Amino acid sequence: MASLKVFLAVYLLGGITFLPLVLFTLYKIHLLYSNLKSASKKELDHDTADEIDEKTRLLARDIDPEFKARKLEEQLGVKVFNKGWITVTKQYYYHSSEVAVILKNSNNNKDSDTALQEQILQRTDLKKKQRFFAVLRHGNLFLYKDDSQNANLVHAISLQNRFITIWPRFDELGKEELPDASLFTKRTCIAIFKNDLVSIDSKNHNVILPHFDPLTSAESNNGDISTNDTTHEYQSQFHSSNQFFLYFDNNMDKEDWYYQLINASKNSNSLSTGLLDPNVSANAAHLKTKDMLQLIQDINSTENQLTTKWLNALLGRLFLSLQQTDTLNKFIHEKICKKLNKIKTPGFLDDLVVEKVDVGDSAPLFTSPELLELSPEGSTKIAIDVQYRGNLTIIIATKASINLGSRFKQREVSLQLSIKIKEFSGPLLFLIKPPPSNRIWYAFRTEPIMDFEIEPIVSSSKLSYNVVTNAIKSKFAEAVKESLVVPFMDDIVFYPTPNEVYRGGIWEEQDPEAAARARTAAAASDMNNTSAKEHLEALQEGGMKTQSRIKKALRPERKKENLKDLVDASGVATKTTTQTTVTTATNDDVSSSENSTKSRKYFKNSIKKIGRWYKDNVGNSSDTEDMDEIDVQDKKNDDSADERESDNPILTSNPKMISNRRPVPRRPSQPLNTLSPKLEGRKEKDTENFPVPPSASNMNASKMFANKENRKFSVSSNDSQNSLKNGDPHVKASKLESSQAFVKKTSQNRFNDGFFKQDLEFEEQREPKL
């Protein structure tokens, strides 16, 4: 019975609890599955994000972004240790540059300056006994006589409640603090002051230090820390001193000692909050270990980094040093504000205001540099690929106008936009134009790859509002395309011109007097060149006019003089013309005038003789009319010849006679042997070679002169005159008929002496044989 009761109890209880237990089990399984699914989804999202930059994120994946390894290794307080040779004094010894300024401002004579210079403590007065082997440990600076292991301790300087600074802190005039470039130079030293001597201006945060008069007489020991410790009085005076000055031979060692002394003056138990406390104002801004490892991995990631590894390492190291400072934040903030002011926002968004800037974790990387152009004029073009994945984040505030329709009132909502630049890469072009350009122009050669992550925040909660994010993304891409893609370029000024008359260029030094002298010299040179050119042109023009007058004087001789004399005279005239032209080219005015004067006299006399002969021998009107027509035609020909001669170069050869320009009588109807009794005695063979010319009715004299091949003889002027004197009826008849013809002058410059030779041959045949 007992077993039956137990069975019934178990059965009843099991039936009641079975369904709840099953439901509870299913619920637990569902929760476990949901947790596993969400975990796998997060891991998948994390892996997807890491795939974007898997190579650069692989080693730095599990490191805390804020971890700084150097901060853990830094030695502070009593743990600081350093040693080396230094020179220590209780009084400040002035540098030679400071002494020169002091003497200049003293306004004394030379004797007073010499005496004053002897009173001032100078660096050249430092002695060997002031040089010690210093050991920094346990928060104290121990000074030894030498660096041996058993060296005697001379002095010990406690660094607790001490202010360490670079001295002098101000320039030679004592008005402005030294620039950072002059802190670690031969002029400066390290000063150790007691905190009681130093104060700080709470308003401007300026350090107020004790003032030292260079004319103050030195102490009894001249500021020395003597190695002779026999007198207790001197030891007491030394330990009660409030300042020490440390001089170093090496400026780089001076920097190391400066940082070590500051760290040694730190006290971990100090509760002070003043700015003079090194625990407050002298905490080193160590680099983030994750960012430093990422930089090391980036510059060794690909083959393209080999040529620019040094550049990327330098830029990355400088970026990480400024990453936590306000200087870089302000610089980027200013640049972004200028760019945002140029962006046209959508109609439903107000102006964009930058509230916060996070510079990211890395600097841009530059790869594949290429020199495209470097000209002698100075034009320079450099192409390089740039890649940025530093996660620069900007918080922008604006207002959005939300319109939900006519039934609802339009509302304005304040927005905060978180814009993160995940990637910004492309081929970059740098351009430096020839002088006077003073800036570097840069732009992307093609549209860069841009990956923005924009998240609007309303009432401190993130919203997924695609209309706003897409509009802002498109506006950012449009702004980049319109300002940083070729042909649109931005610039970096490397030489500012705030005080220049003409801004935006590199000009030569301004010297108005020198510029005026240069312009005067250039104007005088141009004037001399112009006057010389005009003088030469005038001489050439005078020579051409002289040559024209000579040619005009030659015309009557060609008409009236004997052909042979005319040729000789023309040769002389041409030679004279040539000599005159050459003389003109060489600017010999005297010789040119003499030659032209002689030529004019010679031809003037010749023309007078020709005129007298013309009056005596030519009397009929028909000849005069014909000669007038010939003169008119000759004048036209001469004018055209003068025009051609002005265009063509001057020829120096003798002119050729084309026509004898004299009247030719009609051919008699009787045979030629009956014209004169001189021909009766000729043999028959002498006249066989002279065929009977055609009659006058068939051929006139002009055709006879024009057809040179058929012309075999001519009548000279002497024969015609003899015929007239002898009373030849045929010649007189021809004289009365006045049948005359002339051949017009051609444009040839050479004289064809064929006619002259034929006349000579004909005269020889007509002469009687003795």
Curated annotation (Swiss-Prot):
Question: Is Transmembrane one of the keywords?
Answer: yes
Q: What is the effect of changing L340A?
A: Failure to mediate ceramide transport
The cellular location(s) given in this protein's UniProt record come to: Endoplasmic reticulum membrane; Nucleus membrane
Compositional bias (Basic and acidic residues) = 554-566, 679-688, 756-770
Q: Show the PROSITE patterns listed in the entry.
A: SMP (PS51847)
Q: Which residues lie on this side of the membrane: Lumenal?
A: 27-770
Primary location recorded for the protein, binned into one broad class: endoplasmic reticulum
Q: Which residues are glycosylated?
A: N228, N263, N279, N300, N391, N528, N529, N595, N620, N700, N718
GO molecular function, a single term? lipid transporter activity
Q: Which CDD domains match?
A: SMP_TEX2 (cd21675)
Give all Phosphoserine modified positions.
Answer: S640, S669, S717, S720, S723
PH domain: residues covered: 114-266
Function as written in the Swiss-Prot or TrEMBL entry: During endoplasmic reticulum (ER) stress or when cellular ceramide levels increase, induces contacts between the ER and medial-Golgi complex to facilitate non-vesicular transport of ceramides from the ER to the Golgi complex where they are converted to complex sphingolipids, preventing toxic ceramide accumulation.
State the name under which the record lists this protein: Nucleus-vacuole junction protein 2
What organism, scientifically named, is this protein from? Saccharomyces cerevisiae (strain ATCC 204508 / S288c)
